[in-house]
């Protein structure tokens, strides 16, 4: 009993020590603090946000998203029965006997619900990867942090974590600079061409090879090709557009006009959503609170609403 108490005291003491400014100093040796080159960066707020005193919540959040995605993905791939003809379409769940008469297909309501939940969880996988690239899943355990990031991005679409990490910090170091920011448009800020260039910046033949291998493995385990196309291709593609639209296009979109294609949209010009905390979460795991993300790049996604309150930006009147 005394040994357990001593260990708890020691653990609390180490966490308290780890929550000191030393954590941010260690973070700054591995990552990059934002530029303070403009009053719009509000340098007085630089130290207003303090990172979590423990890595426990960040790790728990990551494991919860991974575990929930895995359960829903396996259900979608192996248990959903997609209709193969118009005769098999039915909106609501039916009895087993009726389902057999309809070819054994799942109801459209069931299919839609699983697709919506899975797409949202795909978004969560990428947001967790994004946190890993910022070291914010586990600020004090870099190897565990990067391992979780690697797992999430592999489950998402087999992207190369190291490549994503490098390019994402190019985005933070050259935010809104045409030709330097891989997330920014290439001279045409239109939604479709920007999304196309954004996606092409991160995709590779090696990634497609791994996706093909993964699809073959799933088929060998009994997954129907139609399920793979819907739940392993369409869902993450829709998720990618959601991430792009709310986390890149809207926050960094230049002001309309003849010079829109050449405007520099430095990080402190990023926009922040006025959505409530709940809607911000449902939209994109708070990725729409983008000024705050660039102001405090060491803040995990689940603390961005707190960061918005610190900044006072984008707050709806009820929260002001």
From Swiss-Prot:
Which reaction does this enzyme catalyse, per its entry?
all-trans-beta-carotene + 2 AH2 + 2 O2 = echinenone + 2 A + 3 H2O; echinenone + 2 AH2 + 2 O2 = canthaxanthin + 2 A + 3 H2O
Q: Which Pfam families match?
A: FA_desaturase
Q: Could you state one GO biological process linked to this protein?
A: carotenoid biosynthetic process
Keyword flag Nucleus: no
Q: In which pathway does it act?
A: Carotenoid biosynthesis; astaxanthin biosynthesis
Query: If you read the UniProt record, what top EC class would you report for this enzyme, in one word?
Result: oxidoreductase
* Record's keyword annotation contains Hydrolase: no
- What EC number(s) would the UniProt record show? 1.14.99.63
Cellular component, GO annotation: membrane
Q: Which GO terms describe its molecular function?
A: oxidoreductase activity, acting on paired donors, with oxidation of a pair of donors resulting in the reduction of molecular oxygen to two molecules of water
Keywords in alphabetical order: Carotenoid biosynthesis, Oxidoreductase
Query: What does the UniProt record say this protein does?
Result: Converts beta-carotene to canthaxanthin via echinenone.
What name appears for this protein in its UniProt entry?
A: Beta-carotene ketolase
Q: What is the lineage of its organism?
A: Eukaryota, Viridiplantae, Chlorophyta, core chlorophytes, Chlorophyceae
